[in-house]
UniProtKB/Swiss-Prot annotation:
It comes from Streptococcus mutans serotype c (strain ATCC 700610 / UA159). It holds the Pfam family YpsA. Belongs to the UPF0398 family. SUPFAM superfamilies: MCP/YpsA-like. This is UPF0398 protein SMU_470. PANTHER family: UPF0398 PROTEIN SPR0331, UPF0398 PROTEIN YPSA.
Length: 173
């Protein structure tokens, strides 16, 4: 069994505020290409953290690929109340995460920032590799998780970068 942690930028970090934004189409094309590659390499579990943006788009791609490929999807939320204050539209997205094959929360409620480090460590300890939409030139809080990933021995990290997306746009033209 091979598990891959899937995470990346949130939609607002990319300046994407509408579900019809054309940038999402490009991002999903990259995700589909990479997911097919991972599946052909033997990945059988995709693990999500339940975040909007890249993770949600990746979840949508994974759900569309489930008819062609044998895979399982998991969501491990940091807290049981994750997303409880999201808008109605985003609640629908949260519901999709809650419909994956395996759903758990690491903590009941937020108590202190140390929980995030423990949560991230748990995810890394229970996955074999990561797929991350992250670019070192556009730092966000993802940098902490990325640093943990790259510091872990024998933990391959596949990065999707803005340069990769530019290549896909070039292929469109």
């Amino acid at each position: 069994m091979t598990t891959i942690l899937v995470t990346g930028y949130k939609n607002f970090e990319l300046g994407i505020f509408q579900d019809k934004d054309p940038k999402i189409t490009i991002i999903k094309k990259a995700i589909k290409r990479d997911f097919i590659h991972f599946l052909e390499e033997g990945v059988d579990w995709f693990v999500f953290m339940g975040n909007l943006g890249f993770e949600y788009w990746a979840l949508e791609v994974a759900l569309s690929l489930q008819t062609e490929y044998d895979m399982q999807l998991a969501t491990i939320f940091p807290f049981e109340n994750h997303g409880e204050h999201w808008s109605e539209a985003n609640q629908e997205k949260l519901f999709k995460f809650k419909q994956t094959d395996f759903v758990k929360s690491s903590y009941k409620r937020y108590q202190n920032s140390y929980q995030f480090k423990k949560y991230n460590q748990f995810l890394l300890d229970n996955t074999d590799r990561a797929y991350l939409f992250y670019d070192k030139d556009k730092e966000t809080n993802l940098k902490y998780l990325y640093q943990m990933m790259t510091a872990k021995d024998n933990y391959p990290v596949s990065l999707l970068t803005f340069e990769d997306l530019d290549d896909i746009v070039q292929d469109f033209d």
